[in-house]
């Protein structure tokens, strides 16, 4: 399943998101959701320990000035990769 987080993790039921993640799922951080990828925040460690791949939309990282502040565990992607993820996953959950 593809999960997309478009809101700030501080304004989302992040605990519920973590509970619903399963091995093989993928999470795309976009819009204000990219703030979850910033090194040192309280949500990042939970994401790093989850059995999933985490991506961040590069355009949103750039727009928020965060490109140099995310860990290597978070994979920056462009809109073409975003489309590939949506095609890959028949089911999706938006947060």
UniProtKB/Swiss-Prot annotation:
Record's function text: Part of a sulfur-relay system required for 2-thiolation of 5-methylaminomethyl-2-thiouridine (mnm(5)s(2)U) at tRNA wobble positions.
Highest taxon of the lineage: Bacteria
Alphabetical UniProt keywords: Cytoplasm, tRNA processing
PANTHER family in the record: PROTEIN TUSB
Subunit structure: Heterohexamer, formed by a dimer of trimers. The hexameric TusBCD complex contains 2 copies each of TusB, TusC and TusD. The TusBCD complex interacts with TusE.
Protein name: Protein TusB
Similarity comment: Belongs to the DsrH/TusB family.
Broad class of where this protein is predominantly found: cytoplasm
SUPFAM superfamilies noted in UniProt: DsrEFH-like (SSF75169)
Localization of this protein: Cytoplasm
GO biological process, one term: tRNA wobble position uridine thiolation
Record organism: Shigella flexneri
Coiled coil: none
This protein's GO CC annotations: sulfurtransferase complex
Encoding gene (name): tusB
């Amino acid at each position: 399943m593809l999960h997309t987080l478009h809101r700030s993790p501080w304004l989302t039921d992040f605990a519920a998101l973590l509970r619903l993640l399963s091995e093989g799922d993928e999470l795309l951080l976009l819009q204000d959701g990219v703030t979850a990828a910033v090194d040192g925040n309280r949500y990042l460690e939970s994401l790093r320990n989850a059995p999933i791949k985490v991506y961040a939309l590069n355009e949103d990282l750039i727009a928020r000035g965060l490109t140099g502040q995310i860990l290597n565990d978070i994979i920056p992607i462009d809109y073409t990769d975003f489309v590939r993820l949506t095609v890959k996953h028949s089911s999706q959950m938006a947060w």
